[in-house]
């Protein structure tokens, strides 16, 4: 018997509601990729024996200070299985190497240096609590040298190297692991770069699939986490750069400034939710394109970015929800690298931003937001003076 039109409408409605429920439920659980991801932090002792050998011939320093405190961030790790993982790491000293009293003159010049690595990490479980960990892979060494009166005493350098290491891990539980670790990157005679050794202690936090009861609670909470949002924004230096400077300097240095400054700009942003908790936290990815005009000379340039986004919806009321957001290290393209005579690096850079906003309306279909932003390459290249984006006001809608 042919299906009646009313029955067809009912079937279609049930299907749509079921599909929407599945979609909402799927965002309350970590994806397969995220459930194998982890993040980490190590602090410890770094050594690279900088000496007068790094200086240009004819120059000597009476005092070379090599601070040894350093940190290493595991920006992203991925567990293939219990025997093998891969990591992206970023390591830098807390304070820079300094050359003082050069050729009898009272100079105090810093050498900026950091190491980014992509490594494979084999692991050998010893028992349920301890494991031996290895490390081997690719390293990118970046050094910004020193100069006096446009005379380079230590050249800038960016080159590929290797990174090897190993350590012991103690598994507190299925999410937390404590680590003791050592790593090594060899010297490069051509670049006059000494070897780098790092000895550290730290932790690793692993994401895991959530229990079914937690997923059910998160997905059926009744709080709205918009699936997608599209925004258009306008940036202006008319209010000044006070907000940028406040959050990039003491007493609250939680963001970055920049030597090149933007006068105005227009942005287009797309964001998509991929995970949310019951009420407050959500994780999203986004994409943006933007047009900018510099503050000093009115130079035009463009950017395009992909980025992760952390959102914290801290206040929920009947008419609006209020949130704070923070995004860091979004891979980006920038069309111009010298802006108002400021050398910002290469055309590959990173986007960072922080802000606050609201979702409004019965189904939270309307969005308004303001934020500050920043572009820099994270010292992947010797020139890294950064671009400061002033307050940006955005309007958008969700769907």
Predicted regions and their residues:
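Transmembrane beta-strands of outer-membrane beta-barrel proteins
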Residues: 37-41, 84-88, 116, 132-136, ...
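Gram-negative (and chloroplast) outer-membrane scaffold detector with strong preference
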Residues: 47, 75-147, 262-334
């Amino acid at each position: 018997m042919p299906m009646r039109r009313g029955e067809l409408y009912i079937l279609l409605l049930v299907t749509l509601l079921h599909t929407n429920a599945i979609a909402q439920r799927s965002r309350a659980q970590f994806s397969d990729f995220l459930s194998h991801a982890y993040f980490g932090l190590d602090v410890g002792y770094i050594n690279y024996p900088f000496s007068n050998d790094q200086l240009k011939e004819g120059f000597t320093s009476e005092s070379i200070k090599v601070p040894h405190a350093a940190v290493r961030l595991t920006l992203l790790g991925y567990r293939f299985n219990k025997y093998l993982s891969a990591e992206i790491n970023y390591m830098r000293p807390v304070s820079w190497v300094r050359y003082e009293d050069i050729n009898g003159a009272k100079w105090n010049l810093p050498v900026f240096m950091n190491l980014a690595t992509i490594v494979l990490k084999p692991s050998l479980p010893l028992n349920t609590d301890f494991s031996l960990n290895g490390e081997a892979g690719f390293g990118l060494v970046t050094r910004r040298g020193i100069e006096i009166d446009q005379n380079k005493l230590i050249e800038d350098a960016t080159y590929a190297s290797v990174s090897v290491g190993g350590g012991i891990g103690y598994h507190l539980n299925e999410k937390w692991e404590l680590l003791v670790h050592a790593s090594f990157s060899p010297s490069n005679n051509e670049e006059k770069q000494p070897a780098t050794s790092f000895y550290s202690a730290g932790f690793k936090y692993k994401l895991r699939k959530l229990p079914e009861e937690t997923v059910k609670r998160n997905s059926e909470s009744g709080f709205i986490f918009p699936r997608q949002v599209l925004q258009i924004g306008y940036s202006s230096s008319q209010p000044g750069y006070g907000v940028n400077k406040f959050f990039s300097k003491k007493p609250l240095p939680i963001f970055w400034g920049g030597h090149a400054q933007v006068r105005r700009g227009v942005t287009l942003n797309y964001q998509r939710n991929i995970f949310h908790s019951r009420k407050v936290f959500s994780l999203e990815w986004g994409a943006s394109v933007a047009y900018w005009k510099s503050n000093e000379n009115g130079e035009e340039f463009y950017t395009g970015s992909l980025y992760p986004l952390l959102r914290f919806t801290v206040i929920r009321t009947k008419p609006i929800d209020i949130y704070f957001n923070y995004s860091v290290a979004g891979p980006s393209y920038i069309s111009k690298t010298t802006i108002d005579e400021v050398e910002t690096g290469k055309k590959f850079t990173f986007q960072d931003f922080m802000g606050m906003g609201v979702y409004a309306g019965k189904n939270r279909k309307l969005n308004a937001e303001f934020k500050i932003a920043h572009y820099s390459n994270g010292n992947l290249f010797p020139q890294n003076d950064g671009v400061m984006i002033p307050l940006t006001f955005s309007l958008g809608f969700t769907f």
